[in-house]
């Protein structure tokens, strides 16, 4: 390929909306172009990167016996309604683009394909003898992101590999899960990115075991917590830990204290000489369920801890046996709309009475109540008195009507002791999620009545797994992880080209002839090579070569008259002058050595 025919347009400066370095470099290097918010065109250089990632994915999944297919992007709403996900994905802040056809039938643009693939399996796989089966696709997906940002990291249209496995029993599902874990590690290593596998929440997909693969980077949107010995890693949404022990209150009879203008934990500590870990913080929230029901929730948590809304959502779903559409804090405006008298925010206790909700126009009239383990473990504590600017001190759980349901709904934090080994402590890193694997169990097969006949002749739902990789995300994550001040440093395996030849002066006949000769030799040997044959200043070509990040650069310049060229390695910028007759052999040897070190 010649640069003169590549439609290469590079930019000196990044657009203002490109916040992180990988986004900036992909725009500046002419890899992607923004069409509108969250929607990008993949230009020729980027498409070559994507195709190479796809090739690696296909090789590894095919080696595991997976079968490639292509599923429709338009999904009928009735399938999603059967699994209970239509409302959650389309109402309120739901992420599914949806529309109606000419006959008024509701359709969604698929962000994920569990419903479609489960229907296909239910109609195609009838016997345990046909199992296991693992189907995958590489497909454009859609998410109606509220705030698209960071280029391909959080976009509204993206490329994803998703796979779905079907099994006769749970043990076989676990075997497939382990096999896909192995395949994912090989895929990411071959793509030249360093990942950390972390325990993760299953979210709206559902299921039992779940694991994310994270590229560690300062620009990562996810906070991951890792033990110093590396034996434990989890997304903060999922992480468990041992918090610092609370300082116990001295034993005293319960008292009522006036707390004027002391509506926060900090104000209470400052004015009353208490510690945050001696106070119970009570939070009121509203859970909006898939059936439209609105359920107030009362949460008690130790004052020095933060609420983990993901854990809370899971506990509410489990307790009510319903999926959540949304979870939000209750405000005074919400109370006004329900026709309720004001709840004494800042002075709420764990025993706030249900009568507060008795006149609610649409909410359930009883709280669902939870206490985090940190609050439950306090023998004596300070809490709100359910009256404005009043608190109770030295109270026990028996003084406030007893313990509600005790659950783990706190955020694990850096510095906490590890749950598996209290001699280890958690440290934090930022991560970019590039892969996620789930053991779905029978959630979708049961909802859609997708059954097979087992060895005993009985009908039962499939056991299922699902496995996703963000293809376009891998490409940008590689840039985020591997760049310098001059531009991108592509891993060899996914670089758009392996070698770029820069002819410093295209009008010099010797340089031009030598550059063309090396180009032809490399192409003949199967090397992916790009020839910069533009009539531009050498400095412009060198800057562009640095920016687009091709791993190896051959510079055909003034030394060509003596039969020598410069060979530059992009990753460390090492340069050597080399005889033009051996540069092809050296490049083939270097590229072959690198490829063999990451192949399986």
From Swiss-Prot:
A GO-annotated cellular component: cytosol
Chief localisation class: cytoplasm
SUPFAM superfamilies noted in UniProt: Class II aaRS ABD-related, Class II aaRS and biotin synthetases, YbaK/ProRS associated domain
Nucleotide-binding recorded as keyword: yes
Domain of life: Bacteria
Record's catalysed reaction(s): tRNA(Pro) + L-proline + ATP = L-prolyl-tRNA(Pro) + AMP + diphosphate
Subcellular locations according to the entry: Cytoplasm
Keyword annotations: Aminoacyl-tRNA synthetase, ATP-binding, Cytoplasm, Ligase, Nucleotide-binding, Protein biosynthesis
Cited InterPro entries: aa-tRNA-synt_IIb, aa-tRNA-synth_II, aa-tRNA-synth_II/BPL/LPL, Anticodon-bd, Anticodon-bd_dom_sf, Pro-tRNA-ligase_IIa, Pro-tRNA-synth_IIa_bac-type, Pro-tRNA-Synthase_IIa_type1
Intrachain disulfide bonds: none
UniProt keyword annotation of ATP-binding present: yes
EC number: 6.1.1.15
PROSITE patterns: AA_TRNA_LIGASE_II
Pfam families according to UniProt: HGTP_anticodon, tRNA-synt_2b
GO biological process assignments: prolyl-tRNA aminoacylation
Gene3D superfamilies linked: Anticodon-binding domain (3.40.50.800), Bira Bifunctional Protein, Domain 2 (3.30.930.10)
GO molecular function: aminoacyl-tRNA deacylase activity; ATP binding; proline-tRNA ligase activity
Family note: Belongs to the class-II aminoacyl-tRNA synthetase family. ProS type 1 subfamily.
Functional summary from the UniProt entry: Catalyzes the attachment of proline to tRNA(Pro) in a two-step reaction: proline is first activated by ATP to form Pro-AMP and then transferred to the acceptor end of tRNA(Pro). As ProRS can inadvertently accommodate and process non-cognate amino acids such as alanine and cysteine, to avoid such errors it has two additional distinct editing activities against alanine. One activity is designated as 'pretransfer' editing and involves the tRNA(Pro)-independent hydrolysis of activated Ala-AMP.
Assembly description: Homodimer.
UniProt domain comment: Consists of three domains: the N-terminal catalytic domain, the editing domain and the C-terminal anticodon-binding domain.
Name listed for the protein in its UniProt record: Proline--tRNA ligase
Organism of derivation: Prochlorococcus marinus (strain MIT 9211)
